[in-house]
């Protein structure tokens, strides 16, 4: 399990919904340098029967690093690769600790935006589409899910169907195509 969509970089080796080993660090922009050594330090070099990767939304570069690494390892090891949403990971961790039927996850999306998505507990599922809203337009009420980034260890709690291992950016890229005149 690989999580690089936020300021954190975390990995976990999970077997039968049980975390065998994990590592996590808040790295900011250092995902590319930290990810592969973290995986290599897991038992068996981190080799697994399947790879799950956080597809975002979150850090543009962090998402690309995680998805590219997951795809490369999956190809090299001959194992399937699947994705999940960083917001679903946060919701799963919340439900594991709280007796609530629903939660709305709000994370900082950068560029003055926040990503917002509600989830239901059983089965863990989205109850509305991902929204990108200006940071000053959000009023958060009710229970607080916490300020920390998602952690790969919580992937064992996910029950939703996996996503294809493709980035979920949450907004259009800042780079714009140039048109020759």
Which positions does each model-derived feature cover?
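Oxyanion-binding and handling regions
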Residues: 1-19, 26-37, 44, 79-181
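Short, conserved beta-strand segments within well-ordered enzyme catalytic domains
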Residues: 12, 24, 50-52
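N-terminal, well-ordered alpha-helical segments
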Residues: 33, 37-40, 67, 71
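Short helix-loop-beta connector
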Residues: 45-49
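DPxDG-like acidic metal-binding loop motif
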Residues: 52-81, 86
